[in-house]
Structure formats: C-alpha cells, structure tokens
Amino acid sequence: MFPDFPARRSLTLAALATAALLASCAKPPPPLPPPPPPSISLSSKLIDQASAYRAYVGRASTISPAFANGQQVSDAVRVGAAYQPDQLLRGAIAYGAVAALQDPAFVAGVRAYVGDATQRQTIAYQIMRDPTYAVGISGSASAAGLVIAALGDNGRKVLDQGRQIKQAAYDIQHSAWSKGEVAGRDARLLQAKQLSTTPGLGEVDDAVRLQQASVGAQPLGLTGAAVPPPYSPLVVRSLAIAALAALGYADDAHLDHAEPLMTDPASTTCLNMSKLNLYQCLAVAKPYYEDVFCLGQHVLEDTGACLMKGAGLVAPPDPIIEAAKARAAEAAATKLVETSTKRPRPRRTKR
C-alpha cells in the first residue's frame, strides 16, 4: 500500500545519522568569558564616617585661643566636646583606608588578585578573619606611610591647638571676666555629655571628594615615607579596609563584612578616658579660665594625643612646658653658682 515507506525511512535514518556525525565533529562553543573584575569601591557609609571625622578635626584644630568673654569660652567647649568616641575612631579608620588607597603600589598589589574570582574571595576572607593579612600585600609599607602621615598630622593639629588653648587659660586670668563663675555649670556639663553621644556629620563636598579619592579619580595629595611593620592596630585596620575596597568587598553590598574591622579597643579606651577626664574637669571648674583649661587639656590635647597614638606615633613634648623646665633649670643653676661664690672661705687655723 505504501511501497516507498521503507525507502523514506531509511533515508531519514541516514540523514539523522549524518547530522549526528557532523555534530560530533563540530567544535564545541567557546566558554563564556569570566565576569569583569569588580571596581574599587568603598561604602558610602564609610565615606560619610571619614568625612565626619575630618569635619571634627577641622573644627577642633581651628578653635581660637583668643578668648574675649565667657560666651566665646562656652561656645568653644561645645564645639570641642561634639564628638562621639566610637564614631570618631571609625572615621579615623575609614579616612586611613582612603589614604591607603592613594598609594598606587598598594592598589596594584591588591588588584593583582581580582582577576580570579576564587582567589579574590579567598584573599578577602583571609583579611576579614585576620586584618594583619593585608600587611603582607605588596605595597603595604608605602600605603602605611600615607596612613600614618595623614592620621598623625590630624592628631598633631588637634594636640597643638589644645596646648595653645591650655596656655590661654593662664594668659586670660589678667582679664576680670575670666574669673567670673561659668553660667549654668550643671547644664553645660550635661550638654557636654549629650554632645559626646550624638553622631557628628561631615560636609557633603568633602564626602564627594573622599569618594572620588578612594577610586583614584581625585587624589588627596597626601605624602609620607614608606614605613616598615609592625603597625598599630588602627593602621592595620585601615590597610585591611583599603584592601577589601580594592577587592570589591567594602562596598555597600558587603558592608557587613567590613564593619567588624572598624574597631581598635586601645584607641577607644584612650578617647573614652579623654571624655571622662573632661566630665570630671567640668564638674569642678567654676571660673571661665578653668573651663578653658578643661577644653585645652582634656578635649583637644588628650584627643589629639589619642589620635597620634592610634597612628603609632608619640606625642611630642609640650614646647611651653619644656621651655619652663629649661628656665627653671637655668635659674637653679644660676642660684647654685651665686650661692657657691658667696660662701665664706674657711679660716686658716694658727699653729
């Protein structure tokens, strides 16, 4: 009934067999290219913390010691006391990370690992588990030098301003107003405590500049000589955050992985002690010149010393104190010479 059916069936099978043979001989499609490596990215939250830190340093280091009345003293105390220790520390680490990202050698050393997704993830997780892992990355010494220079300079500015203001506490005592009792003493102590628990804010323009600097679009112009390890915990964590940013693991999506590194117990203790000393000082201070001393010593000089110590630096001796010591030593030496020259000579006894 269908005499050509077997023939057609044979042809179909033959065609299928030929197609299968040709398919087996064809080259397989090329593998999909790997995804492009992630770009350098630092979370906007970390950038904001760095900006808030820089804003406080800028305000504190420009408080004028030329006080003319009690209101100026009260205003200056409010400005100086307005930082939250934990936030200031996180801001210092974040700014240190931006500083480290200014070093081309360190960035290149980290970016050498981003081509392989598995290797990139491994390096990032190593840093998350142990921040000191970042110290072993090529270029870390020059990056650490920038971190130390940037944070050390910030701390030195605040410290030096504090010393000038502390000296003003003695100088203004020639003015009658400085010996008047501070108005609302209890309220100003309470306000200092409230300001110490209120997060600070940075400048929008500065945050934009830091964001651009973190990706190499607008360098900050920092300078600093390479420094070999060991480094302070704060510097190590700045390097670690910078390395995670260069690996693509410090952006907003990975912030939960980066935030645990934003700590330094020693610096936290130092800043908290500065605050405690401020509260105790304000609690007993009565005249305005004593508030000026509290501001200079415990708000600014102590805080600046904490920032320098966090960067692994030692606060330099106070030149005013050193000069006073030198004058005292010179006076003592002069008095000793005068005493020795006036001492009567022993009489000779007759034989």
Identify the residue ranges that each predicted region occupies.
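Bacterial N-terminal signal peptides that target proteins for export
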Residues: F2-L13
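A near-ubiquitous, low-amplitude feature marking generic local secondary-structure context
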Residues: R8, P36-S39, I93, V227, ...
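Bacterial N-terminal signal peptides
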Residues: A14-L21
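Short, low-complexity, Pro/Ser/Thr/Gly-rich segments in the mature regions of secreted, periplasmic
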Residues: A305-R351
